[in-house]
Amino acid sequence: MTPLHIRFSSHALNERADRITYIATTIGFGEVIARKVVEDKRGKAVRLLTDTGVIIVTDIHEECILTMWIANPTQVKDFYPEGVRNQAVLRLVKKYMEKGYQDKQNKQKKGN
């Protein structure tokens, strides 16, 4: 078995540490079920959707985690232009919205 070498960006470690901890302790990171390459003014990156409804953003080589967040239904649907194949994940993120997880992940630094 080849060891997995993934590192976290300084942004993930410093500015998103509370969010990442919240995800790890609330719903877990999960297994990758879909991926897509995205590009913006900073360049290309890979977005990974997990079976727990988390989006993990990595560098183009999938060696460095840049950030992550709990997806909302629209973000899950963006991975499936032909229609969502994994309805379980869609139901999960809708349940997370009912519980306010998407909002809570962003309030961790504020002490909430």
Predicted regions located by residue number:
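Ribonuclease/tRNase effector modules and their secretory precursors
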Residues: 1-112
